[in-house]
């Protein structure tokens, strides 16, 4: 009888743990505003929606490191583009949706810093910037507090690095970042 009661408590504990971890794995949705250069002498405020379905795991980054070192850059880019961590969606961007291929959440004193990585793409239909082949990625940086509010930056032309700590970091950037403000966790 004691074994049944103990096993029942163990199953209840496991079920509670799994349900709480499932709640932690729910998608996060952020909204933000960005000042975007439009036609000459004008600037528009655009709203952006960012949905993060999951964050990059150590195993995924380790796999990318292995592919890069053993099979080369093109295979690395294929493996990188195969990862789907969420969507960067400019509202009113004429149907443009950019898939996020890498995502990290780094705890800070007041909240966390979220880094999102994708291959370089034009997300603003009104802009056609010059590109540099050395900076083939786009990085979105969100700095949010415990309540999910904060600021951020979009680095449209960035280079990335895979670290031995199994993370992806921005190595440098070519053009000045666009400032995000009114960043809010909406879901």
Residue ranges of each PLM-predicted region?
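Boundary at the C-terminal end of the N-terminal hydrophobic targeting segment
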Residues: 22-27
């Amino acid at each position: 009888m004691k074994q049944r009661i103990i096993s029942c408590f163990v199953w209840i504990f496991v079920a509670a743990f799994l349900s709480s971890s499932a709640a932690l794995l729910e998608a996060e949705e952020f909204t933000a505003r960005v000042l975007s250069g439009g036609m000459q002498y004008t600037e528009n405020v655009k709203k952006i929606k960012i949905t993060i379905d999951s964050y990059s795991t150590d195993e995924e980054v380790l796999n990318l490191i292995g592919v890069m070192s053993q099979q080369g850059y093109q295979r690395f880019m294929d493996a990188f583009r195969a990862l789907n961590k969420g969507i960067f969606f400019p509202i009113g961007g004429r149907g443009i949706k950019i898939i996020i291929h890498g995502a990290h959440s780094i705890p800070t004193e007041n909240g966390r810093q979220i880094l999102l990585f994708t291959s370089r793409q034009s997300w603003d239909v009104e802009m056609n910037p010059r590109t540099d082949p050395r900076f083939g990625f786009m990085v979105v940086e969100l700095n949010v507090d415990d309540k999910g509010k904060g600021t951020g930056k979009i680095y449209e032309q960035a280079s990335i690095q895979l670290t031995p700590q199994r993370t992806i970091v921005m190595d440098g950037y070519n053009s000045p970042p666009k400032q995000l403000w009114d960043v809010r966790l909406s879901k």
